[in-house]
């Protein structure tokens, strides 16, 4: 008699995805971040669900309802800070996951990569709308500044902004619809994750060498389930240290002041995980140009498969491109720092230089490095 998990219509999907999945025997801990992102998503959906039970999406009571959650609801403070800091952990895992994909040439699995880009954009949209919900100063002004960017779209821009606002400024209708979208998007993300996995399992995972590993595959369970479990334990430990010891380390003090449309904060800035894109946006003096650069900072990832010039898949045996890659990582850290600084000398000029470097590295330097390495290999 065959085991139920191999025959049952529902269980066999799980069996082929998480138990008997043939997996390369040499994948490193960099391949853990997919499962960690799944864990982050589950934590966010669960904590978000419990927060939604006590939150009110009305401008007069939103701020008070968040204070009520922290003060009066049993373990409300824990749920709230797990949700807020869980978003930070989510983005840390996302950036490392994308960074791994670039380093090991995973972008050559085009469908998986493109669904991943859509996922990244959707998670960013969800996080942005979530930041608006507590209705603090930075929530309100962040929403005003970012939604206002759509007014840069020629002809329909102003109408579009008012349509999104539901009025002539960010107000009650904006908050209500942002809450509705923030609630539904994680479920859309979950569906996209399944599509992402569907495409991944069509080709199978890559491995650090970039070579075909069909001859050396092992079952996912128990080898990688136990490895993912260790990763999950480390992630949850890091999250709980953040939540229990430094809950406000990554937040903005301005968000503990209720939203006031008559008082603009000195420095309007988004959460830390958007600072690199915000720096690119601010580094271009033209409004429409800034919006396009902001979009391109993420969408440029879709060009990675086209810009791949090397005969090798990964960067493991390519020291020149490795150097360029780590310069790109340093550049992104500089952009993140600049995004949190005021627009004045010397920050403005550093931001412009770092923005030019960001696009130049991806579009020009990495493809050239690949060609040079091909030529060096041909000489041998």
Swiss-Prot record:
- Supply any other comment: Heme 1 (or BL or b562) is low-potential and absorbs at about 562 nm, and heme 2 (or BH or b566) is high-potential and absorbs at about 566 nm.
Protein known as: Cytochrome b
Q: Give the CC-aspect GO terms.
A: mitochondrial inner membrane; respiratory chain complex III
Q: Could you list the residue ranges that cross the membrane? A: 33-53, 77-98, 113-133, 178-198, 226-246, 288-308, 320-340, 347-367
- List locations, semicolon-separated: Mitochondrion inner membrane
Keyword annotations for this protein, in alphabetical order, are: Electron transport, Heme, Iron, Membrane, Metal-binding, Mitochondrion, Mitochondrion inner membrane, Respiratory chain, Transmembrane, Transmembrane helix, Transport, Ubiquinone
Residue sites binding heme b b562 per the record: 83, 182
Binding residues annotated for a ubiquinone, in chain numbering: 201
**Membership in a protein family:** Belongs to the cytochrome b family.
SUBUNIT field? The cytochrome bc1 complex contains 11 subunits: 3 respiratory subunits (MT-CYB, CYC1 and UQCRFS1), 2 core proteins (UQCRC1 and UQCRC2) and 6 low-molecular weight proteins (UQCRH/QCR6, UQCRB/QCR7, UQCRQ/QCR8, UQCR10/QCR9, UQCR11/QCR10 and a cleavage product of UQCRFS1). This cytochrome bc1 complex then forms a dimer.
Q: Topology in the membrane?
A: Multi-pass membrane protein
Binding site residues for heme b b566:
97, 196
Which cofactors are reported in the record for this sequence? heme b
- Domain of life of the source: Eukaryota
Q: A GO molecular-function term, please? A: ubiquinol-cytochrome-c reductase activity
Report the PROSITE patterns cross-referenced here.
Answer: CYTB_CTER (PS51003), CYTB_NTER (PS51002)
Stated role: Component of the ubiquinol-cytochrome c reductase complex (complex III or cytochrome b-c1 complex) that is part of the mitochondrial respiratory chain. The b-c1 complex mediates electron transfer from ubiquinol to cytochrome c. Contributes to the generation of a proton gradient across the mitochondrial membrane that is then used for ATP synthesis.
Q: Could you give the cofactor binding note from the entry?
A: Binds 2 heme b groups non-covalently.
Q: Which residue stretches, if any, does this entry annotate as coiled coil?
A: none
GO BP terms in the entry:
mitochondrial electron transport, ubiquinol to cytochrome c
């Amino acid at each position: 008699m065959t085991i139920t998990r191999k025959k049952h219509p529902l269980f066999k999907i799980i069996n082929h995805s998480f138990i008997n999945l043939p997996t390369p025997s040499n994948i490193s801990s960099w391949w853990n971040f997919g499962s960690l992102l799944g864990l982050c998503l589950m934590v966010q959906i669960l904590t978000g669900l419990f927060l939604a039970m006590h939150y009110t999406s009305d401008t007069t009571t939103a701020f008070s309802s968040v204070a009520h959650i922290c003060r009066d609801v049993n373990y409300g403070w824990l749920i709230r800070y797990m949700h807020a800091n869980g978003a930070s952990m989510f983005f840390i895992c996302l950036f490392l996951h994308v960074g791994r994909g670039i380093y090991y040439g995973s972008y050559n699995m085009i469908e998986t990569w493109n669904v991943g880009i859509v996922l990244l954009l959707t998670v960013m949209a969800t996080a942005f709308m979530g930041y608006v919900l507590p209705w603090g100063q930075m929530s309100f002004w962040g929403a005003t500044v970012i939604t206002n960017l759509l007014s840069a779209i020629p002809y329909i821009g102003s109408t579009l902004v008012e349509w999104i606002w539901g009025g002539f400024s960010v107000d009650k209708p904006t908050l209500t619809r942002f809450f509705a979208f923030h609630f539904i998007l994680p479920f859309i993300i979950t569906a996209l994750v399944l599509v992402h996995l569907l495409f991944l399992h069509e080709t199978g995972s890559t491995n650090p060498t970039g070579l075909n590993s069909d001859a050396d595959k092992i079952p996912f369970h128990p080898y990688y389930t136990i490895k993912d479990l260790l990763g999950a334990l480390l992630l949850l430990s890091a999250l709980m240290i953040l939540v229990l010891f430094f809950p406000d380390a990554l937040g903005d003090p301005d968000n503990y002041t209720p939203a006031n449309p008559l008082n603009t904060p000195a420095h309007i800035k988004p959460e830390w995980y958007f600072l690199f894109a915000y720096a690119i946006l601010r580094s271009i003096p033209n409004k429409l140009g800034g919006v396009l650069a902001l979009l391109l900072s993420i969408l440029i990832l879709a060009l990675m498969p086209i810009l791949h010039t090397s005969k090798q898949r990964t960067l493991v045996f390519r020291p020149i491109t490795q150097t360029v890659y780590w310069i790109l990582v340093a550049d992104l850290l500089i952009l993140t720092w600049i995004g949190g600084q005021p627009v004045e000398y010397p920050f403005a000029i550093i931001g412009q230089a770092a923005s030019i470097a960001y696009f130049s590295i991806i579009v020009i330097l990495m493809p050239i490095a690949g060609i040079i390495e091909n030529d060096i290999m041909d000489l041998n």
